[in-house]
């Protein structure tokens, strides 16, 4: 029997991540090849014409799974009845701007979108925040949408997770699908900690630890970490635009695994509301290793954390606590 369509909201839909993301959703990359979707696209009034152009292209692409398109500049209309919300819209930092100025712009955006989602989205709506500062934007959204369960609000660190998988696969010259269980801890910023201590590679002789196969701790503890941390900046330098294709693809991965589940024995990285696991302060949106089942994530528990890792986990938590304080200071 045909499934009922799922309503998926993309904010900032006329932007370049939105432009890469909506065809992926319409093709079934996010929710599966048998799941019809209705796309809700929101952007700001100056982008209304461009947004309409994206809608025209979606019609022209004749996607079999796409059962409808709502393109609007009205947050209430955009949020009404949505089951999944991918928050790509935000205020990007421009040259010469202070962090606090950017933060205050994003706080006001996420405050108003939180209330639209809370009042109008479907009851069990899953929310993914992509716009930077992603962790803190998600935290503001959570604060201003108290009736949305905290387990339904997340931010994107799957892009960093996939970047880490990609670096290992290139270094070892193996298929990226054979590498698993890297972890991104903390903030989606250059303070994040890409951790390979529990990661493995499928080989003809069974699963082997990444550390053993790479056999170069200096690289794994140095250049590997900084490459993943700085990858976004490297892409901007090369493309003169921020990473859009990879961000869109990882947003699909994040939602797909959350809704449809992670394979047995595999975990992924998601920015979720901290409950104090791994001695990370509660009350932050922090990236953890998670496994997903029946539409719910749970933090993978009991992984040993060495001294090197502990320092990194604490440093990124500290940055998130500072961001949280800065965001709250914008609320007054």
Swiss-Prot record:
Keywords: Cytoplasm, NAD, Oxidoreductase, Tricarboxylic acid cycle. PROSITE patterns: MDH. One of its GO terms (biological process) is oxaloacetate metabolic process. GO terms for molecular function: L-malate dehydrogenase (NAD+) activity. Its EC number is 1.1.1.37. It comes from the Eukaryota. Its main location: cytoplasm. InterPro entries: L-lactate/malate_DH, Lactate/malate_DH_C, Lactate/malate_DH_N, Lactate_DH/Glyco_Ohase_4_C, Malate_DH_AS, Malate_DH_NAD-dep_euk, Malate_DH_type2, NAD(P)-bd_dom_sf. NAD(+) binds at residues 16-17, 43, 90, 113, 132. SUPFAM superfamilies: LDH C-terminal domain-like, NAD(P)-binding Rossmann-fold domains. The active site is at 188 (proton acceptor). It catalyses: (S)-malate + NAD(+) = oxaloacetate + NADH + H(+). Oxaloacetate binds at residues 99, 132, 163, 188, 243. It holds the Pfam family Ldh_1_C. One of its GO terms (cellular component) is cytoplasm. It is found in: Cytoplasm. Coiled coil: none annotated. Belongs to the LDH/MDH superfamily. MDH type 2 family. Homodimer. NCBIfam families: MalateDH-SF1, MDH_euk_cyt, PRK05442.1. Catalyzes the reduction of the carbonyl group of oxalacetic acid. No activity with pulegone. This is Malate dehydrogenase. It comes from Nicotiana tabacum (Common tobacco).
């Amino acid at each position: 029997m045909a499934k009922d369509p799922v309503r998926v909201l993309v904010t900032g839909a006329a932007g370049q991540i939105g432009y890469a993301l909506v065809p992926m959703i319409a093709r079934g990359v996010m929710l599966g090849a048998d799941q019809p979707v209705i796309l809700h696209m929101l952007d700001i009034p100056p982008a209304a014409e461009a947004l309409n152009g994206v809608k025209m292209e979606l019609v022209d692409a004749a996607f079999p799974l796409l059962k409808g398109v709502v393109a609007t500049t009205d947050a209430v209309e955009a949020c009404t009845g949505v089951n999944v919300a991918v928050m790509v819209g935000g205020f990007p930092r421009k040259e010469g701007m202070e962090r606090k100025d950017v933060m205050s712009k994003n706080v006001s955006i996420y405050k108003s979108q939180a209330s639209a989602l809370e009042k109008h989205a479907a009851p069990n709506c899953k929310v993914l925040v992509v716009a930077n500062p992603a962790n803190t934007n998600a935290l503001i959204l959570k604060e201003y949408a108290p009736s949305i369960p905290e387990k339904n609000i997340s931010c994107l660190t799957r892009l960093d997770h996939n970047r880490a998988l990609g670096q290992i696969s290139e270094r070892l010259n193996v298929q990226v699908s054979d590498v698993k269980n890297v972890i991104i801890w903390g903030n989606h910023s250059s303070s994040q900690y890409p951790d390979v201590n529990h990661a493995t590679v499928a080989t003809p002789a069974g699963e082997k630890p990444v550390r053993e196969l790479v056999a170069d701790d200096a690289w794994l503890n140095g250049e590997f970490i900084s490459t993943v941390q700085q990858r976004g900046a490297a892409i901007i330098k090369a493309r003169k635009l921020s990473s859009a294709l990879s961000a869109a693809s990882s947003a699909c991965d994040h939602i797909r695994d959350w809704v449809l589940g992670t394979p047995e024995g595999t975990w992924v990285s998601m920015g979720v509301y901290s409950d104090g696991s791994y001695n990370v302060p509660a009350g932050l949106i922090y990236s953890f290793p998670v496994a997903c089942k029946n539409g719910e994530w749970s933090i993978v528990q009991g992984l040993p954390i060495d001294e090197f890792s502990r320092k990194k986990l604490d440093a990124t938590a500290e940055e998130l606590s500072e961001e949280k304080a800065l965001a709250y200071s914008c609320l007054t």
